Amino acid sequence: MRRIDPSKLELEERVVTINRVAKVVKGGRRFRFAALVVVGDKNGHVGFGTGKAQEVPDAIRKAIEDAKKNLIEVPLVGTSIPHEIIGHFGAGEVFLKPAAEGTGVIAGGPVRAVLELAGVQDILSKSLGSNTPINMIRATVNGLSELKRAEEVAKLRGKSVEELLG
């Protein structure tokens, strides 16, 4: 998979969650903040990242840097995706189904952030299993990265697009 250069894209960021985490030491608890951020150009590129620091802004900055390193390309067909797919990660599953134009993004929480920043405007989704934000985002990104256009599938099978689609 080729790496996508984030400097050539106009990326938009969205903070999904900020979590306070604690390390218990002899003198009490040491608190830090973990941030989960999604970045995308609303035109077929999306990525997510996590960052941890003692202050919230630092955690968000680290998460944005991480997200820019993990960009993927999403094949879009019009305003939706080419076909149905289930993305898996851990105990989390996200079902993604293309929808007719004008349907909108029907998705909950973290999944919505990923789909909107990827540039998908019409889609149906259902999250199954784990509802932890990081697992849902990873399952969604996993599903989106496995999508293939009809042309790619036809080329793999050595057939024409017309033969493939009937």
UniProtKB/Swiss-Prot annotation:
Q: What would be one Gene Ontology cellular-component term for the protein?
A: small ribosomal subunit
PROSITE patterns assigned to the protein according to its UniProt record, in alphabetical order: RIBOSOMAL_S5 (PS00585), S5_DSRBD (PS50881)
Q: Name one GO biological process term.
A: translation
Please give the Gene Ontology molecular function terms for this protein.
Answer: rRNA binding; structural constituent of ribosome
The cross-references to Pfam families, in alphabetical order and at most eight, read: Ribosomal_S5, Ribosomal_S5_C
Question: From which domain of life does this come?
Answer: Bacteria
Domain S5 DRBM positions: 11-74
KW rRNA-binding (keyword) present: yes
Could you tell me which InterPro entries the record lists for this protein?
Ribosomal_Su5_D2-typ_SF (IPR020568), Ribosomal_uS5 (IPR000851), Ribosomal_uS5_bac-type (IPR005712), Ribosomal_uS5_C (IPR005324), Ribosomal_uS5_N (IPR013810), Ribosomal_uS5_N_CS (IPR018192), Ribsml_uS5_D2-typ_fold_subgr (IPR014721)
Provide this UniProt record's keywords sorted from A to Z.
Ribonucleoprotein, Ribosomal protein, RNA-binding, rRNA-binding
The record's family statement is: Belongs to the universal ribosomal protein uS5 family.
Q: What is known of its domains?
A: The N-terminal domain interacts with the head of the 30S subunit; the C-terminal domain interacts with the body and contacts protein S4. The interaction surface between S4 and S5 is involved in control of translational fidelity.
Q: What is the documented function of this protein? A: With S4 and S12 plays an important role in translational accuracy.
Q: How does it assemble?
A: Part of the 30S ribosomal subunit. Contacts proteins S4 and S8.
What is the recorded name of this protein? Answer: Small ribosomal subunit protein uS5
Q: Which organism is it from?
A: Bacillus cytotoxicus (strain DSM 22905 / CIP 110041 / 391-98 / NVH 391-98)
Name the gene for this chain: rpsE
